């Protein structure tokens, strides 16, 4: 069987929960052939893998959403759309019922010049219709260029050559969901969507926090992600969520209930038995571990501020931030600077480590994320008999406080961005 894994912004370029899950799944089925279709920001990331690919990965295909060469790709071929193609494009821009298969066929069969399409008459008139009907109070030139920048990555996805496979497995909706839908349409393979976080909600949270995006354009972007998710849900043969509430959100966002199933995360708990104890020096502290990537979605700045607040009240505390800090170097630099400015001692940024070397002597672990699914770091902490402090996001409440059981609490839950 030939299985195409479609991922956006994670495996095999970035270490993290979803990437680790994909890597483990591929290794679990050594007799199956896997191909990767990896969606990344730009060509600078090409081939820079954070994982050694298993032997049963036979191909890697890359899609660049910020492709500097988009204007020269497939140059100067057909730009005038047929009536049904224009209707599908206009419906897409107006957030109406979109004939996605018409768009799939148009981009696949016509050697489309994305430059010609975005700068051409048909796209201009469709944008003008959307503007007149829905957004007449904003500056048209700004609206036009926003729509071009918004639809560039989608059109790049639609113009991608889809490798043939028996199964297409997207680990999110969004652009990965579009690719999976196209794979099913063109090659008649089965299509599975497995969401670890709810993609649309995560993008919405990022947009709400973004200061550089005007409110009107935030709403336009949010609707864009919602309709992309909806086509994936409608096309997929099965859609999995990590826990019950996640599936409820997927249904609200348009997934037919009969397609939904809960597939919770799991870990090899035996790896966390008889973990090494810490050194006598480390045992002098109350050790707090954070197994996280240093990225905005993990809200490391709140973690640092919370530690500073607690350190003043309990000088024996020591914080270990265990995870890579090269994914978003500017944000990581801001975190390092914040720790220096707050004059906090006893914070260690370890980089990527084997967590089993550390968990055995942690007194607790902490997670300050603004968005999560069902965090593996919490499951690993529990396997190591370590309690957890976590924000009330994703399935953290169910993990810490239980769901229909009487085991009691396994930690403390708090709201996001709470330094106290």
Which residue stretches match the model-derived regions?
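Short acidic alpha-helix that forms the nucleotide-activated donor recognition element
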Residues: 230-234, 351-362, 383
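Carbohydrate-associated surface elements
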Residues: 245, 266
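Conserved donor-binding/catalytic core segment of Leloir-type glycosyltransferases
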Residues: 276, 280-309, 320
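Glycosyltransferase donor-sugar binding loop
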Residues: 318-333
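Nucleotide-activated donor-binding/catalytic signature segment of Leloir-type glycosyltransferases, i.e.
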Residues: 332-352
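Aromatic "clamp/platform" in nucleotide-sugar-dependent glycosyltransferases that forms part
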Residues: 370
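Short hydrophobic beta-strand element within catalytic cores of glycosyltransferases
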Residues: 387-390, 394-400
